[in-house]
Amino acid sequence: MLQRPEYGEGHPERVCCYCGGYADTVDHVPSKVFLDEPYPDNLPVVPCCRKCNEEFSLDEEYVAVLLECVRLQTFDPYQFKREKVIKIVKHTPAILSTVRESVLQLLDGHYTIDSENARLKRVLTKLIAGHLRFEGLDQLFLHSGLKIDFYQDIHTNDELFRRFYSPINSDLLPEVGSRALIALVKNGYARSQWFTVLPGRYEYCVALDNSEVRIIIQDFFGVIGHKVDFRNG
């Protein structure tokens, strides 16, 4: 990835991106467990406390295995494609049983993920928070009205696929000095930009008014995190 410095002052570097406590380390966004080696240069990082960093680790490994099982429709580690997932299962064999118990099986035999899976939602919320912080945007709606839509095999639904890549226009400008505003100035238009962290593995897009975050994982799973408009129910 291209290096994207930030010049704003609205987000102190010593405040944890996730809990608001003292940040004594940094966290990669996305977590490396969702990427494959060799990693690209200039991976995005955000300030984080060690407690949050460690607490998210097990859930992230679980989600990485969950996504691999459902994407490939198998629980056989010998059929897994991602080396990182294979290593997780070798190190923690019991994780496969945990994943299998949490996966839903459809009438046609296909496996699918429960979108209300608590561990999945926790990790997705973390990713959304990290992307908002990295772009220098407000995270307040995460605590007051976040809705997460989770989709599988997005390429099979043309309408959904177009929705993901449709531009998110905004009438509001991001904070001065933020990465989001710098990208806007370079592009010359007030719409969000897609950033590819690793081709075929992870890309994301953040609305300039911080109202929405879109993520595509493994070129298969789609995530939309957005504000809930309580006025419309």
Model-predicted regions and their roles:
Residues 1-15:
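Short, charged surface segments at domain edges that flank catalytic/cofactor-binding sites
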Residues 15-45, 56, 61-62:
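Histidine-centered nuclease catalytic patch
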Residues 54-90:
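Polybasic, low-complexity binding patches
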Residues 49:
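Zinc-coordinating Cys/His ligand positions in small cysteine/histidine-rich zinc-finger domains
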Residues 84-122:
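Short flanking/linker segments adjacent to small metal-binding domains or redox-active Cys/His motifs
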Residues 114-233:
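C-terminal, charged low-complexity interaction regions
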